[in-house]
Regions:
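Alpha-helical cap/lid subdomain in secreted, periplasmic
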Residues: 1-109
Length: 109
């Protein structure tokens, strides 16, 4: 979790050093077997927590043009996967729709 936080903080700092372009951080979509596999659930939720800690820290510091898309906003369902991790066509469409909606929100602000 702390490693993810550090990596996100570093990545945003490197981008901000050169550009004020909007940055959209997107949470891990999870795994299809996470509801029945505690290890898989813990893995992706830990990664997402680490990223969220970095986002919150950056927002508290006043980092401009930083945005966030949550796991829940991605809206994956059981049919969104072809296996444990790779999205099906439906999953890819859900991800594209969620990212598109967020990008429209960012660009129209």
């Amino acid at each position: 979790e702390q490693e993810v936080t550090a990596l996100v903080l570093d990545a945003v700092a490197k981008i901000r050093a050169k550009s004020n372009t909007p940055i959209l951080l997107v949470e891990h979509a999870g795994y299809s077997n996470a509801p029945t596999n505690a290890a898989q659930y813990e893995l992706y939720t830990r990664l997402n927590r680490g990223q969220r800690v970095a986002f919150d820290k950056l927002m508290n510091e006043g980092t401009p043009n930083l945005f966030y898309l949550t796991h829940d906003q991605l809206g994956f369902s059981p049919d969104s996967w072809v296996d444990y991790v790779h999205p099906s066509d439906l999953g890819a469409q859900k991800q594209a729709d969620a990212v598109t909606a967020k990008l429209k929100e960012i660009l129209n602000r």
